[in-house]
Amino acid sequence: MDVDVKRLCVRIMLSVLLLLGLAACNDRRPLPQGDTYVIRNDGGGQLISAEADRAVLRLWSGPVEIEGYCNSACLIFTTLDNACLDPELILGFHGANITVGFVGNPQVSKYLRNGIKQKFDDEWQHIPFTEIHRITAQEYVALDPQTRICS
């Protein structure tokens, strides 16, 4: 096969993979606007989208308040340095529907800290993705004292 044809095939394959990756990331949260970014009643969604959104919020560095409920992939926002938990927040944990290598449960676990990480690794990651274990913001902070309650 000619070198130019090989290069063209590689470019086409890389373009297709890029498009597939972008298509998989289809539940992004809105970009930050204003003084405070509020995450409210977030059921989670695709982990790859949450990771991208977390990176945006980390770089933005404005205050992030998490209110209502925060389940599943939303949990990775709780450890942002600029995040705080509303005192009435309920947080929900379960295992990933797909866990292969570093994908799924290890992807969530790497963002957690202290007692929350320990509980997730030891217990909560084994909860089927069709069920959920809920805790309050106060219970969360008791397990991860680095996390702040919003004032």
Q: Model regions: which residues?
A:
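Bacterial N-terminal signal peptides that target proteins for export
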Residues: 2-13
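Sec-dependent N-terminal signal peptides
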Residues: 12-20
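C-terminal motif of bacterial Sec signal peptides marking the signal peptidase cleavage site
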Residues: 22-24
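N-terminal secretory signal peptides
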Residues: 26-80, 145-151
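Charged, glycine-interspersed solvent-exposed loop segments at helix/strand-loop junctions
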Residues: 36-39, 52-61, 102-151
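Surface-exposed patches in mature extracellular/periplasmic domains of secreted proteins
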Residues: 64-69, 87-90, 122-127
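Gly/Pro- and small hydrophobic-enriched strand-loop and loop-to-helix capping segments
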Residues: 82-104, 149-151
